[in-house]
């Protein structure tokens, strides 16, 4: 956060993902920028970062206006990731279908492209572009 940029008011990468979100009716939420980059490298472009471990009300409103019907929660397998998952679930479970893929690593950003293709993509059931 800074005087001119408040992370809780934005979703990282939304400007790149918005057309893919509308096309697939699915938004994939990850914690950080590195996670967004890694998923893009694996061909999953309807993903955005929440800048940390909790979803703000402003970010929730952005998701509600994104055209998504499904929210994929793809946070890390550490304590912060579990906190983020709970925050997202609390704000989105009554408004969206929720998908929570499982993966073997701790950090999404540390996975190889091959691991994402093998472990994550099949669980998305074609809800990516």
Question: Where in this protein do the model-derived segments appear?
Answer:
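Phosphate-handling DNA/RNA-contact segment within nucleic-acid enzymes
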Residues: 1-66, 84
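Acidic beta-strand-to-loop metal/phosphate-binding motif
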Residues: 29, 66-80
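Short, aromatic/basic amphipathic alpha-helical patches
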Residues: 83-93
């Amino acid at each position: 956060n800074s005087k001119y940029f408040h992370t809780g008011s934005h979703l990282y990468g939304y400007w790149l993902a918005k057309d893919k979100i509308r096309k697939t009716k699915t938004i994939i939420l990850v914690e950080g920028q590195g996670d967004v980059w890694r998923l893009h490298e694996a061909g999953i472009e309807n993903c955005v970062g929440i800048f940390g471990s909790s979803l703000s009300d402003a970010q929730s409103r952005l998701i509600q206006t994104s055209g998504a019907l499904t929210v994929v929660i793809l946070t890390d397998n550490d304590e912060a990731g579990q906190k983020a998952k709970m925050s997202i679930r609390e704000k989105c479970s009554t408004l969206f279908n929720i998908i929570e893929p499982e993966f073997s690593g701790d950090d999404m950003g540390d996975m190889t492209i091959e691991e994402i293709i093998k472990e994550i993509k099949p669980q998305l059931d074609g809800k990516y572009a």
